[in-house]
Design a protein with these regions (language model features):
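Aromatic- and glycine-rich peptidoglycan recognition patches
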Residues: 2-41, 157, 178-228
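Activation targets extended, charge/polar-rich intrinsically disordered C-terminal tails
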Residues: 3-7, 11, 25-28, 127, ...
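C-terminal region of N-terminal signal peptides and the immediate post-cleavage residues
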Residues: 28-55, 60
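N-terminal capping segments
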Residues: 47-131
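Extracytoplasmic low-complexity repetitive segments enriched in small/polar residues
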Residues: 78-85, 163, 195, 210-212
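Hydrophobic aliphatic residue packing
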Residues: 126-129, 168, 187, 208
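...with weaker cross-activation on analogous glycine-rich loops/strands in unrelated enzymes
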Residues: 136-204
Length: 228
C-alpha cells in the first residue's frame, strides 16, 4: 500500500469519493436539521433551490455550542484506528455509507452508497468527528475533499491562517488550487516553523494518525465557527 494512499482507483461509474464531480452541490452539509434528516419536500425546482441554499448558508455560519478543543479531543481519541486490507472496515466509512449525506453525494457523483465502505475516507473521518461532537453544521460532511473545501469557501469561511480545530486541506504538489486538493484533516496547532501539527484519517497505511506537515503543502483552511 502506497504511503498517503488517499485516492483509490475506482471503476467507471463508481463513486468519485476522491475524484468526484465539480458541482457546488455540497452546501447540503450545513443543514440545521438533525443528522440524516431528509431534505425539504420539493416545492418547485427554483423555489426549493433558493430556500434550501438560504437555510444551508445560514446554518453553516451559525456558531455551534462546541469548542475547537472538544472536536480535537474526539479526533485524537481515534488515533490508531485502521482500515482493513480492502481499504474499508472503519466506523467512519460505515457511518457515512448509511447517512443521508451519502444519498445526496451519490446523486451528485454517481455510484451507490455501499461503495463508500471501501472508498478513501479522510474526509469521512473529518465529517464523522463533526457529527459525534455536534459540530457537523460547522465542520461539514462529505466524502470528496474538493467539495468539502468548496463548501467552506462558498460560506466565506476559507483562509490561509492555521488555527486549532480548523479543517486543513492539502495538495501534495504544493498547488493552492482547491481543484488540486488530495487530503484533509484537523489542525492541532501552528508550530511556528513552517509546519503544523494535525490529526488526519486515512494517512500512512490507512490509519488515523497525528502528523506534522509543512505549510507548503496546504491549499487552505476551513474555519468552523466554534464556541469560544
Amino acid at each position: 500500500m502506497a504511503k498517503h494512499r488517499l485516492i483509490r482507483a475506482l471503476t467507471p461509474g463508481t463513486i468519485r469519493a476522491a475524484l468526484g464531480a465539480t458541482v457546488l452541490a455540497s452546501a447540503a452539509f450545513g443543514a440545521v436539521a438533525p443528522a440524516h434528516a431528509d431534505t425539504p419536500e420539493q416545492v418547485g425546482p427554483a423555489s426549493q433551490s433558493s430556500v434550501v441554499q438560504t437555510a444551508q448558508h445560514a446554518a453553516a455560519n451559525q456558531r455551534v455550542n462546541v469548542t475547537a478543543q472538544q472536536v480535537l479531543n474526539v479526533a485524537r481519541a481515534q488515533i490508531g484506528t485502521s482500515e482493513n486490507a480492502a481499504g474499508g472496515g472503519t466506523k467512519f466509512q460505515k457511518w457515512y455509507a448509511t447517512s443521508q449525506r451519502a444519498m445526496e453525494t451519490v446523486k451528485r457523483d454517481g455510484g451507490a452508497p455501499t461503495e463508500y465502505l471501501n472508498a478513501a475516507w479522510c474526509s469521512m473521518f473529518v465529517s464523522w468527528v463533526g457529527e459525534q461532537t455536534g459540530a457537523r453544521p460547522q465542520v461539514g460532511w462529505d466524502a470528496y475533499t474538493v467539495e468539502h473545501a468548496r463548501w467552506f469557501a462558498a460560506n466565506h469561511r476559507w483562509g490561509s491562517t492555521p488555527k486549532p480545530g480548523a479543517v486543513v486541506f492539502f495538495s501534495w504538489s504544493g498547488s493552492k488550487s482547491i481543484d488540486d486538493i488530495n487530503h484533509v484533516g484537523f489542525v492541532v496547532k501552528d508550530n511556528g516553523d513552517g509546519t503544523i501539527s494535525t490529526i488526519e484519517g486515512n494517512t500512512g497505511n490507512g490509519r488515523v494518525e497525528a502528523r506534522v506537515r509543512p505549510t507548503s503543502q496546504v491549499v487552505g483552511y476551513g474555519y468552523p465557527n466554534y464556541k469560544a
